[in-house]
């Protein structure tokens, strides 16, 4: 099955503490989760690693978010949009369902 959300897609968060925020997908994980730039930030306590010259402390990083809690952002309409698939010139492409515009 083809992925509706891919790396470098611009998304909008539908539910949770970051509802309404937009960001770019950094990584798509296999368990139906994605990591998005600047979304779902958590504080991680890291031990120092003297061998690698890394200091310890509290570090903020992005945690994974469920694919069901995000949607692709359609710049033409300015809203979240659903994704469909169709064939153009023998290739399977994604498109926005609201205005049938092909996703690059």
Curated annotation (Swiss-Prot):
It comes from Serratia proteamaculans (strain 568). Part of the 50S ribosomal subunit. Belongs to the universal ribosomal protein uL24 family. This is Large ribosomal subunit protein uL24. The keyword Magnesium does not apply. One of two assembly initiator proteins, it binds directly to the 5'-end of the 23S rRNA, where it nucleates assembly of the 50S subunit. One of its GO terms (molecular function) is rRNA binding. One of its GO terms (cellular component) is ribonucleoprotein complex. GO terms for biological process: translation. CDD domains: KOW_RPL26. Keywords: Ribonucleoprotein, Ribosomal protein, RNA-binding, rRNA-binding. The keyword RNA-binding applies. SMART domains: KOW (SM00739).
């Amino acid at each position: 099955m083809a992925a509706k959300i891919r790396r470098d897609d611009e998304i909008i968060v539908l539910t949770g503490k970051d509802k309404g925020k937009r960001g770019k997908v950094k990584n798509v994980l296999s368990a139906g989760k994605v990591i998005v730039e600047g979304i779902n930030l958590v504080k991680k306590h890291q031990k120092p690693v003297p061998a690698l010259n890394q200091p310890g402390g509290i570090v903020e990083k992005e945690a994974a978010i469920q694919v069901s809690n995000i949607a692709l952002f359609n710049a033409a309409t300015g809203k979240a949009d659903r994704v469909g698939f169709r064939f153009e010139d023998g290739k399977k492409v994604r498109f926005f369902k609201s205005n049938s515009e092909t996703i690059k």
